């Protein structure tokens, strides 16, 4: 039986949206306000439609790089964490200002891996999410890059968004990328690459389609998105990869249009 997106989306309530550094910042690390405003407007519209919206946002380190006038993303952990500490405030202030223009309230939650795997801490995190959503607050999530160390870090926000989706019992996870979705091969170097619209199951062939690193200011590539898809779909949550630069792409998603790559949930 052919999968019907529109039919599934009728019962969707909780939507987690992850947006990456490549969408939020320019190559020099400064914030791309055009893309951020476009993103916020779409999220507000989803919220107005009655959805609970949870945003997992990258961009803190990138914003810090821009503010500190660095020429590239820092290599050492202390410098990365310093950039994150500076950038997180800039990023959240920007979000707060734009969301407030539409009368929306946001709440910041900075997580670590321990918040996902420790039973008590994950329960506390879930309770916090539920309290915010009950009050129609839009949570904005990032990993606590300013203090986390390699041993306890999630490492990328694709994976973080999948864990968050489990915590909030999301009905759909949307990863906004700088590419239309998963292709049969890398479309940047192969003109014959075809967009894969629907993935029933993550097989070795699907995994082989994902390769390459992310941008210099980010940590994720298609491989981390496949990892996120495994986590989400195994928890019964479908995941969608879409191009964050596409005009009104989130509206296309909730209206059931055939955009991006849909990873079906494991029943």
Swiss-Prot record:
Organism for this UniProt entry: Clostridium tetani (strain Massachusetts / E88)
Residues noted as binding ATP in the record, renumbered to the chain: 18, 177-178, 219-225
Catalytic reaction equation(s): L-glutamate + ATP = L-glutamyl 5-phosphate + ADP
Key word Ribosomal protein present: no
Binding site for substrate: 58, 145, 157
Main localization (coarse): cytoplasm
UniProt similarity note: Belongs to the glutamate 5-kinase family.
Enzyme class (EC, first level): transferase
Segments passing through the bilayer: none
Listed HAMAP family: ProB (MF_00456)
Location(s), subcellular: Cytoplasm
Gene that encodes the chain: proB
Enzyme nomenclature, EC number: 2.7.2.11
Domain of life of the organism encoding this protein: Bacteria
Pathway: Amino-acid biosynthesis; L-proline biosynthesis; L-glutamate 5-semialdehyde from L-glutamate: step 1/2
Family annotation (InterPro entries): AceGlu_kinase-like_sf, Asp/Glu/Uridylate_kinase, G5K_ProB, Glu/AcGlu_kinase, Glu_5kinase, Glu_5kinase/COase_Synthase, Glutamate_5-kinase_CS
GO molecular function, one term: glutamate 5-kinase activity
GO (cellular component) term, any one: cytosol
Name of protein: Glutamate 5-kinase
Entry keyword annotation includes ATP-binding: yes
Function: Catalyzes the transfer of a phosphate group to glutamate to form L-glutamate 5-phosphate.
UniProt keyword terms in alphabetical order: Amino-acid biosynthesis, ATP-binding, Cytoplasm, Kinase, Nucleotide-binding, Proline biosynthesis, Transferase
A GO BP annotation: L-proline biosynthetic process
